[in-house]
């Protein structure tokens, strides 16, 4: 499944935590980000294998493994083999740092998710809910303004 969503934000940026993007890829791309990414990222593997490099360390990423990258941390990641399916979320907010401290993600880190099914269910709910958020500007109903030709 390759699916993603980047909401158009307005007042949401005043919230303590907000999603900037969320998605899933059948085959993750090869990314080299010398200046890092501008927002917090959490990426986890659902199938296949990948490799990530940050802070001078290299890690193999397998199903159930995840990594957190704070903003502006230089990194590189890429698939190993033909399949590397990932799910990812990017976020910000004035309480993002406190939330991350609470779950012990204070710096770039690779970790294993013990209950991948529970995390995947939450991920799918967030993706669904993000798609329900109206876009800005809202689409206008033009059905009542159609003119008839004589």
Regions found by a protein language model. Give the residues of each.
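DNA-contacting interfaces and partner/effector-binding or oligomerization modules
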Residues: 62, 97-98
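Amphipathic alpha-helical segments enriched in hydrophobic/aromatic residues interleaved with Lys/Arg
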Residues: 99-150
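Short glycine/serine/threonine-enriched helix-capping/active-site loop
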Residues: 20, 86-91, 140-142
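Residues at the C-termini of beta-strands that transition into short coil/loop
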Residues: 23, 90-92, 114
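Generic protein-terminus/edge-of-domain signal
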Residues: 1-60, 65, 81, 103-110
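Ligand-binding loop in jelly-roll beta-barrel domains
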Residues: 71-95
């Amino acid at each position: 499944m390759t699916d993603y969503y980047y909401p158009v934000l307005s007042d949401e940026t005043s919230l303590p935590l907000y999603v900037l993007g969320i998605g899933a890829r059948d085959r993750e791309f090869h990314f080299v980000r010398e200046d890092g990414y501008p927002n917090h990222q959490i990426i986890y593997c659902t199938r296949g294998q990948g490799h990530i490099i940050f802070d001078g360390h290299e890690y193999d990423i397998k199903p159930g493994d995840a990594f957190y990258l704070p903003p502006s941390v230089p990194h590189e990641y890429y698939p190993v083999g033909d399949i590397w399916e990932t799910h990812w979320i990017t976020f910000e907010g004035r309480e993002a740092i406190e939330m991350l401290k609470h779950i012990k993600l204070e710096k770039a880190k690779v970790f294993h998710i013990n209950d991948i099914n529970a995390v995947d269910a939450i991920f799918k709910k967030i993706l669904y809910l993000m798609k329900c958020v109206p876009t800005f500007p809202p689409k206008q109903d033009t059905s009542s303004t159609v003119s008839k030709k004589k």
